[in-house]
Amino acid sequence: MKLSLQTLVAAVAVAAFSTTAFAGADVEGAKALTKANNCMKCHGIDKDKDGPSFKKTAAKYKGKADAESKLVTHLTTGPKVKLEDGSEEEHKMVKTKDMAQIKNLVAYILEQ
């Protein structure tokens, strides 16, 4: 089988970009942000607390094109959320304006 130079270059480019695109979240950065914002008080990684686990949230948004934007909005606008006891409260907004940090946290949640 004979490969052209164009085919070879295209294959290398696809491999390089897909590795970058799917490199995943900076786990330590995301964990630091969850700690600074006390996220784990209400959310567990794989167990529900007052709020859904990160794993449950990831399953809810799996395969949805708007997952990142919906979660970014949720973390930055303080919407009303319903707790297990039926009461409602405002979800705390993440304490950073750095969109890269917020998107990293969302990527971390969606990877669970």
Where in this protein do the model-derived segments appear?
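N-terminal export/targeting leaders of redox proteins
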Residues: 1-28, 112
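Protein kinase-like catalytic domain
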Residues: 43, 76, 109-110
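Post-signal/leader-peptide non-cytosolic segments of secretory proteins
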Residues: 64-74
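Axial heme c-ligation environment in periplasmic c-type cytochrome domains
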Residues: 50-61, 74-106
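The canonical Cys-X-X-Cys-His
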Residues: 37-45, 105
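Electrostatic cytochrome c docking/interface patches
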Residues: 19-34, 60-64
